[in-house]
């Protein structure tokens, strides 16, 4: 049996707020108080998390005190620089800007700030994944081999991040590298025929609550170790407190029947391949 507590891992989906945002909200007592770069760094050795990928939220009010996309990207860059080689970060989207301006901001994020991909959160932007606004972003990412992470935790078939919207998008951009966050939640079966990677952030404890361990193991087997990516969504979770997230993940994953080689693919191999690290 693989022991996920001691297995080296890259957490491919965490949330960290800039120091300036924490300083501007000193009385915050919600989960975002845990989204602290320095506190997270101190946790990494204990959890055997070798590296982590910071995901923005398509919400400039959370990721800067200037509320601009350029400020968000600068903050993400500074987080990467604070602990070199330990953190990666994906570019944000601010749909107050035109698609052309968004692509320009992504170019700057990659070229000047060395960010590592693009994050789209259709529920936060209010723009459906397959809407025309996103065309220029996907086209740029496909042409420049930039990975895209898509939030997909839909509660209906017409949700902005619904699985069938992802299927449509993948058909339109056949060479795009895509990671589906939260595995498309309870629409995961519609994503089985696709080539998209799946990060297991947030959703894994939900699956166990709904399906039980054995069926959760079966659905992960259907998706395949070559597509699954270890991720937590720390510090956010619908049912767990921040302090409970990693322990819950390790307990669940320890009950899966992945081989050592498969576990290593999920824990760090697939994301390192995507990020070329």
Predicted features, each with a name:
Residues 116-117, 131-229:
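Catalytic pocket-lining loop regions of alpha/beta-barrel enzymes
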């Amino acid at each position: 049996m693989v022991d996920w507590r001691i297995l080296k891992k890259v957490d491919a989906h965490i949330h960290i707020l800039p120091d300036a945002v924490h300083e501007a909200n000193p009385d915050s007592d919600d989960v975002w108080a845990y989204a602290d770069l320095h506190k997270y760094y101190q946790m990494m050795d204990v959890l055997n998390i070798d590296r982590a990928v910071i995901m923005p939220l398509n919400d400039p009010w959370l990721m800067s005190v200037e509320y601009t996309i350029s400020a968000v990207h600068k903050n993400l860059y500074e987080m990467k620089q604070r602990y070199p080689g330990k953190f990666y970060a994906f570019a944000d989207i601010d749909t107050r800007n035109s698609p052309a301006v968004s692509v320009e901001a992504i170019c700057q994020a990659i070229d000047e700030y060395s960010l590592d991909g693009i994050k789209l959160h259709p529920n936060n932007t209010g723009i459906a994944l397959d809407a025309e606004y996103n065309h220029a972003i996907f086209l740029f990412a496909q042409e420049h081999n930039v990975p895209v992470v898509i939030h997909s935790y839909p509660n209906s078939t017409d949700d902005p991040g619904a699985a069938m919207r992802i299927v449509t998008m993948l058909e339109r951009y056949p060479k795009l590298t895509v990671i589906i966050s939260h595995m498309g939640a309870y629409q995961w079966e519609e994503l089985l025929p696709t080539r998209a990677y799946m990060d297991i952030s947030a959703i894994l404890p939900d699956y166990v609550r709904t399906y039980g361990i054995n069926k959760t193991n079966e659905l992960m087997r259907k998706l395949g170790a070559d597509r699954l990516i270890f991720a937590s969504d720390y510090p956010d979770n619908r049912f767990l407190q921040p302090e409970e997230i990693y322990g819950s993940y390790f307990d669940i994953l320890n009950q899966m029947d992945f081989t050592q080689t498969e576990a290593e693919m999920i824990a760090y191999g697939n994301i390192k391949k995507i990020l070329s690290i």
